[in-house]
Amino acid sequence: METVTICASINEKKKAEFFQTMESLTGLVESQCNDLDIRVKDDNSLIIKITFAGKDQMEKNFYTGEFNILKGSVKSLCENVIIKVNESLLNNN
């Protein structure tokens, strides 16, 4: 099991755009992983947990397509973005 965790703070001015983007991407991302959990707290803090069956599934999907759009959207619409794979900080956030 491989788990990717994305933590960030949603920019208040871009909150509506963030939710629209997540709504359009969720189904596509869910089809390429075992589980997708997106949580937003009242203070606009965001935690996205993406679980893959194994390293092969993660490498096949997380570095291409919809996941690149997801990561790019989070990076452009949020602040203080941290991406971890199995609790290890991912290089080149």
Each model region followed by its residue ranges:
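Short S/T/G/P-rich N-terminal loop/turn motif that feeds into the first structured element of a domain
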Residues: 1-47, 51-63, 81-93
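A short hydrophobic/aromatic micro-motif that marks alpha-helical segments and, especially, helix-coil
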Residues: 26, 69-70
